[in-house]
């Protein structure tokens, strides 16, 4: 599993139109269950995604095609982790 930390690097590029393109692009990844969660950081300096893509390379390919990344408005870092504990609602994803 992966935690993706996205950071805004150019707020002037973060328009409602670009944000809609980003959300629409990622929608397919949620439908295929590759992305589990995503949302804004507080304060709004970027966002976080929780991914269960098959590999880091596959996740990187998805991220590099994201309109946020392609526009140069956002950078990202990926941390791989193994979930060992979860609430009852999420026991199915714990190793």
Regions found by a protein language model. Name each.
Residues 1-95:
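Conserved, structured core segments of small domains
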């Amino acid at each position: 599993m992966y935690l993706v930390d996205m950071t805004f690097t150019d707020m002037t590029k973060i328009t409602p139109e670009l944000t809609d393109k980003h959300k629409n692009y990622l929608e397919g990844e949620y439908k295929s269950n590759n992305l589990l969660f995503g949302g804004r950081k507080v304060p709004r300096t970027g966002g976080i995604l929780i991914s269960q893509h098959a590999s880091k390379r596959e996740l990187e390919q998805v991220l590099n095609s994201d309109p946020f990344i392609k526009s140069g408005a956002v950078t990202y870092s990926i941390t791989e982790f193994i979930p060992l504990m979860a609430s009852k609602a999420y026991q199915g994803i714990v190793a």
